[in-house]
From Swiss-Prot:
The gene is ruvB. GO terms for molecular function: ATP binding; ATP hydrolysis activity; four-way junction DNA binding; four-way junction helicase activity. ATP binds at residues 34-35, 76, 79-81, 142-144, 185, 195, 232. Residues 269-357 are annotated as: Head domain (RuvB-H). Has 3 domains, the large (RuvB-L) and small ATPase (RuvB-S) domains and the C-terminal head (RuvB-H) domain. The head domain binds DNA, while the ATPase domains jointly bind ATP, ADP or are empty depending on the state of the subunit in the translocation cycle. During a single DNA translocation step the structure of each domain remains the same, but their relative positions change. DNA binds at residues 324, 329. PANTHER family: HOLLIDAY JUNCTION BRANCH MIGRATION COMPLEX SUBUNIT RUVB (PTHR42848:SF1), PTHR42848. This is Holliday junction branch migration complex subunit RuvB. GO terms for cellular component: cytoplasm; Holliday junction resolvase complex. The keyword Cytoplasm applies. Residues 1-195 are annotated as: Large ATPase domain (RuvB-L). Residues 196-266 are annotated as: Small ATPAse domain (RuvB-S).
């Protein structure tokens, strides 16, 4: 791969939860060392890998640039890694920015004007791009040109500028937040799914080899099933368990060492951490299992409503612990059982009976 330019890219907001799928402060360099360098090294997402291989090989055989590519899915599944792999597979240079960094059309115009033929432009969080920049992007994606407005008011003129043929790779955790015109301009869209435990075991084995960690097979399985289906979380937990093994044991990670370490870091057997359990406990013990509004629930655990709704709730819903209903959040029978409590009679996997009547 040629030059790598991350002009305009922004760091993730700090998040000190070990089970957060977002990058934590200072984690970028370590995360980069574990990134796969080719589609052959990329673990998981078999359908996406196959589809991407066809798109890229077809473009190389034709001697042209591939269609613009949209990668969607939850954070931590490898969208940035795939963008880097796409550039590497095409033997192209990669330019990296993010939606929030493109506040004005001029910001995008400056970046597009520096592209050379065949470059890959990666825009992370593309759903957060400002509207003026997005509208300029339409023309660049379709016709490889942009119209730059010079001057203001009635005397303003539009100057067309040619843009070198390039491939845009957009990444989003909220594909529904993309406008229709932007979404329609991507020739290929790939949705990335959460990983199965067996796939995460392979991710952990590869990472352990790169980091020189002695990881037992059963220990890898233990970490994998607590990683919330997310490779980034799996790699983070691996490093935390390594710390424990080196400080309190002989450095070899066995299943017992992994369990003991994850207990210290408050990550339980399903991957729930202290905040997740606090939300469930408040929902059940303070509100009888619900229904209760997210704002009220957030006050009960001393967090902002957005933290509960965007950080905790997605995994709790996916794990079958919380149900969203028109009347509020409801604890399922699994949530009661997970906290060691007996569900009330009549409660189901979707919460209390009668909520949808």
């Amino acid at each position: 791969m040629g030059r790598f330019d991350d002009a305009g890219a922004q760091d993730a907001e700090p998040d000190d939860r070990d089970v957060s799928p977002a990058l934590t402060v200072g984690e970028g360099d370590i995360d980069a060392s574990l990134r796969p360098r080719s589609l052959g090294e990329f673990i998981g997402q078999p359908r996406v890998r196959e589809q991407l291989q066809l798109v890229l090989e077809g473009a190389k055989n034709r001697g042209g640039t591939p269609d613009h590519i949209l990668l969607s899915g939850p954070p931590g599944l490898g969208k940035t890694s795939l963008a880097m792999i796409i550039a590497a597979e095409l033997s192209s240079s990669l330019r990296v920015t993010s939606g929030p960094a493109l506040e004005r059309a001029g910001d995008l115009a400056a970046m597009l004007s520096n592209l050379v033929e065949g470059d890959v432009l990666f825009i992370d969080e593309i759903h957060r791009i400002a509207r003026p920049a997005e509208e300029m992007l339409y023309l660049a994606m379709e016709d490889f040109r942009v119209d730059v407005v010079v001057g203001k008011g009635p005397g303003a003129t539009s100057i067309p500028l040619e843009v070198a043929p390039f491939t845009l790779v957009g990444a989003t955790t909220r594909s529904g937040a993309l406008t229709g015109p932007l979404r329609d301009r991507f020739g290929f869209t790939a949705h990335m799914d959460f990983y199965e435990p067996a796939e995460l075991e392979r991710v952990l084995a590869r990472s352990a080899g790169i980091l020189g960690i002695h990881l037992g097979t059963e220990a890898g399985a233990e970490i994998a099933r607590r990683s919330r289906g997310t490779p980034r979380i799996a790699n983070r937990l691996l490093r935390r368990v390594r710390d424990y093994a080196e400080v309190r044991a002989d450095g070899v990670i066995t299943r017992d060492i992994a369990k003991a370490a994850l207990e210290v870091y408050d990550v339980d057997e399903l991957g729930l951490d202290r905040l997740d359990r606090a939300v469930l406990s408040a929902l059940i013990r303070s509100f009888g299992g619900g229904p209760v509004g997210v704002s009220t629930l957030a006050v009960a655990v001393g967090e902002e409503p957005t933290t509960v709704e965007e950080v905790c709730e997605p995994f709790l819903v996916r794990a079958g612990m919380i149900a969203r209903t028109p009347r509020g959040r409801v604890a399922t029978a699994s949530a009661w059982t997970h906290l060691g409590l007996t569900p009330p009679s009549g409660i189901t996997g979707l919460g209390q009976t009668g909520l949808f009547d």
